[in-house]
Amino acid sequence: MNQNRTGGVSKVKNKSAAPVQITAEQILRVAHENQQTLPKAPPKQVITDQEELEDYRLRKRQQYESLLGRNRKTAAIYIKYAAWEESQKDLTRARSVFERFLDIDHRIPTVWIKYAEMEMKNKNINLARNIWDRAVCLLPRVSQLWFKYTFMEDMLGNYPAARAIFERWMQWKPEPQAWNSYLKFEQRLKLFENTRLIFEKYILVHPYIKTWIKYTKFEERLGNIENARTIFQRAIEFLGEDGNDEQLFIAFAKFEEKYKEIERARVIYKYAIDHVPKSRAKDLFDTFTNFEKQHGDRIGIEDVVLGKKRFQYEEEIKKNSKNYDIWFDYLKMEEINGEIEKTREIYERSIGNLPPTNEKKHWKRYIYLWINYALFEELISKDMERARSVYSECIKLIPHKEFSFSKIWILYANFEIRQLNLDKARLIYGQAIGRNPKSKIFDQYIHLEIELGNFDRVRTLYEKYLEIMPDNCDAWCKFAQLETELGETVRARAIFELAIQQPNLDRPEVVWKDFIDSEIQLKQFDFVKQLYRKLLEKTNHVKVWIGFIKFVHSIKDKQQQKQRQQQQEEDGDSNTTKKDGGDDDNNDDINKPTREIFIEAHKSLSNSDKEERLLLLESWKEFEQTFGNQETLNQVLKKIPQRVIKRRSDGNGGIEEYFDYIFPEEEKSTQTSLKLLEAAQRWKKLKQQQELQKQQELQKQQQDS
């Protein structure tokens, strides 16, 4: 047993021959086929004397000339041709090839570079110098040529010539990379005065902030602090409004901070905050904040942060004063800061920005400014009279004829409740119901009176509620539930009876369900059956039938359990076993009412949707599997429809497949219709044959005549 579980390579269990055998002949054939597909290398040519060499050169030159004849302007062929001539040590011919192409097109830098590199490789420095000179004269805007030219002179140690080339290049005002190369060249030679002169030209040609900062860093590396400071000041004056960039001021302030000039740095930061547009000063504020954290006190840091945020919010408000999200953020910051008067001032400014139209979608955010204002006065400033005034002014401002907000009425009433002004709170709720009654207001008012125990007032409110909104199912159900909890079952039943008689309920199924559940809790089973019958008269829905069936079966099940308990109490445990065996024989009698309702439902739904009929049959099948026998189950299985796949047009010129169900009673009618269709097709085919024969006879008669 354990030997088969040891590690290592597993043994072959099946040692019989494989069904397909591979022979050596097959292996050789495949290898030969693969070998034939490989590309064959050209044969090596061995040159033994000068005559063969000249012949080889002649053929090679003829090949290149033939290529050039077909591709006269292709630079790559000329470069390869010249490289081959160079490999043959025939530089004259190589130069001739390059010159031929340059006569055709001198605007390709690669050809000039290859030409000059060939001369440099063969140590023809003067020739290379002439080529570079010609190239930069013809193509002065190609930086690569200048770089190569200066690099050659630099490598040769000919620094005056390299400097002269740089000067010629700078006259063309090239990109910053060229100036940086010139600066590195002079710094490498430690000619710092020359470097300063180059920087002075550089900042005029490219008057960018990066250029000025690079100039200051150069002076700083040399230890000329005053010169660096002067350059910063020159940059701010020279650039003017263009110099109002945070990076220049940050670099200047960090420079002063580095050399312990803290007050200078602080002045620079404050000057920058006043002059740099705040939309471009994010890093400036962050850097200033970090600076104050290192060198300032807590008050200074907080002032910096608050000043930054205030300015940002004010800028946003200038752009769009109707952007209420900005107002919310601004007010939240001021509330945290704790300045009551400042916060109150901003609240007054914010509520002055009325929405553009009297549409509720524009007021939804705006109304929260008033709500937050009232809560601020109540909870933070503790000014109750001002809070009451805010609520009152807000209610006056809302166009109640067009729309209203339940939330503001409820908050106002709750505020008065917290001030123990119950009469005032009732008055507010009454005004809300009179102006624009809504479910939330009724619910809150009713909840208040329930908490106070004024049930007569609650009944009055529910009556008013249902008078205004008779289609509100929740109101009917809550009213009936209240009466049930108070023990007034007759009142509750009457309310439900009135509710189900309403023609336009928004969710009638909720009322029926609560009515039925209420009567089940009261154990009025006969009345529940009557309710189900009434509901089925209104709607012949499969879910109602299934609910009715489950209810009837649950009653019978409870009655059966009661009988068993009584028998156990009377006869004892020994006789219980016998009785239980007898109960199995009476299952059919107990389940008979449930089965009868299934049959009734099946007949009632015969003209309904097939999906609903199938749902009922599936429920019936589960019932018979659990409580029935094989005979009753087979009767249900015979009624189960057959699912088939059909096709129909999807309305867009296409065909879609869908599932359909064919019930057993429909199969007979379907078969009859199919037979009629087949007979019609046979008759049509016979008629076509007869017409064809007549046409053939007519054609024969015409031919004979």
Curated annotation (Swiss-Prot):
Residues 559-591 are annotated as: Disordered. Identified in the spliceosome C complex. Keywords: mRNA processing, mRNA splicing, Nucleus, Repeat, Spliceosome. The gene is crnkl1. Involved in pre-mRNA splicing process. One of its GO terms (biological process) is spliceosomal complex assembly. HAT repeats lie at residues 55-87, 89-121, 123-155, 157-188, 190-221, 223-258, 260-294, 304-336, 338-372, 382-418, 420-451, 453-485, 487-521, 523-554, 597-629. It holds the Pfam family HAT_Syf1_CNRKL1_C. This is Crooked neck-like protein 1. GO terms for cellular component: nuclear speck; nucleus; post-mRNA release spliceosomal complex; Prp19 complex; spliceosomal complex; U2-type catalytic step 2 spliceosome. It comes from Dictyostelium discoideum (Social amoeba). InterPro entries: HAT (IPR003107), HAT_Syf1_CNRKL1_C (IPR055430), Syf1-like (IPR045075), TPR-like_helical_dom_sf (IPR011990). PANTHER family: CROOKED NECK-LIKE PROTEIN 1, PRE-MRNA SPLICING FACTOR.
